[in-house]
Curated annotation (Swiss-Prot):
Primary residence: cytoplasm
Catalyzed reactions per annotation: heme b + 2 H(+) = protoporphyrin IX + Fe(2+)
InterPro entries (alphabetical): Ferrochelatase (IPR001015), Ferrochelatase_AS (IPR019772), Ferrochelatase_C (IPR033644), Ferrochelatase_N (IPR033659)
Subcellular location: Cytoplasm
Family of this protein: Belongs to the ferrochelatase family.
Protein name as annotated: Ferrochelatase
Length: 334
């Protein structure tokens, strides 16, 4: 009888300890299999924040054309990455670490273009009777194409659940955090692995955007430039000089004018130097970091006879990044 009572008490204690606040890490997602490559591309190019064509019919038509032109090439990219994007499993590992470090909250994640979608995650949290939510954008800098798209999707999904009305707070950018930037600098130094920083051109490569998006008022370029300036200040404080510190834009798509300079241009321009790349706009490794930066541009660097070409990993599921997320959530104002 005592054993039964003990088990009942344990169940009651566990129920009492069940977190009433959930933190949802919001990101773009990536194919979880080669089959999902089509799903990923279709959802991305049907997003009005990505393909800013106001007419729904025209957007779907143009999006379908883009998907058809890119799907086979994209599948080959993901084949080189093991048949899927690393973004989802790394994010899962990050939430596992977060839940161990901070059991007072429940950490989970939702993706914009592949499962688990925000609607699925929120339905699960409604069943858990969560009372408050934090939508945490995994993009350090704000952009309508990433942050706003994810928030819009999450809030629409929440609105559709008529009986679930938790308190909601958001973290929409965090690039200005000194703690974050110290972690980034340490990642760069770890990648250098005792090489002399002053021998290297440091390129902060970020995802590119069409110039028209910036002209329409998106603050992304401004925030990326500010982020680099903050990191330069930190490098001066830490007496960590580089030959040059530059900002570049990658992943151009289509004939329209995009933000410049491109990462390829800077690699070619500094072909006679040692180069180290840090993916400043991403916190979790994905095809743009592991394929584009670490494979495609590495081959380019080899053809150009670049003296040395290094690519830093993203923050991923590191304990330092997990601790940063927890601190950011705890310090979030009501």
């Amino acid at each position: 009888m005592d054993l039964i009572n003990e088990k009942l008490n344990n169940l009651e204690n566990n129920a009492t300890k069940s977190p009433k606040e959930a933190v949802i890490l919001l990101n773009m997602g990536g194919p979880n299999s080669l089959y999902e490559v089509g799903v990923f591309l279709k959802n991305m190019f049907d997003d009005p924040f990505i393909l800013t064509i106001k007419n729904n019919f025209m957007r779907k038509m143009v999006g379908k054309m883009i998907v058809n032109s890119r799907i086979e090439k994209s599948k080959k990219i993901y084949e080189k990455l093991g048949g899927k994007s690393p973004l989802t499993p790394i994010t899962f590992a990050l939430t596992e670490r977060l839940n161990k470090l901070d059991p007072s909250r429940f950490y989970t994640y939702a993706m914009r273009y592949t499962p688990p979608y925000a609607s699925m995650v929120l339905q699960d949290l409604a069943l858990k009777e969560v009372e408050s939510l934090v939508f945490f954008s995994m993009y350090p800098q704000y952009s309508s194409t990433t942050t706003l798209s994810s928030f819009n999707d999450a809030f629409n999904a929440l609105k559709s659940l008529e009986t679930f009305r938790p308190k909601v707070r958001v973290i929409e950018r965090f690039y200005a955090s000194k703690k974050l930037n110290k972690i980034i600098l340490n990642t760069i130094l770890n990648t250098l692995n005792n090489r002399k920083s002053q021998d290297f051109v440091l390129i902060f490569s970020v995802h590119g955007l069409p110039k028209s998006v910036i002209d329409a008022g998106d603050t992304y370029q401004q925030e990326c430039e500010h982020h680099v300036s903050l990191l330069k200040e930190l490098m001066q404080q830490k007496n960590t000089p580089f030959k040059e510190v530059l900002l570049s834009y990658q992943s151009k798509l289509g004939p329209m004018k995009w933000l410049e300079p491109s990462t390829e241009e800077l690699i070619e321009k500094h072909r006679k130097s040692h180069i180290i790349i840090y993916p400043l706009a991403f916190t979790i490794d994905n095809s743009e970091t592991l394929y584009e930066l670490d494979m495609q541009y590495r081959l380019m660097a080899e053809r150009l006879a670049v003296k040395e070409y290094l690519v830093c990993p993203c923050l991923n599921d590191s304990i330092e990044f997990a601790q940063f997320i927890i601190e950011r959530v705890k310090n979030l104002k009501e």
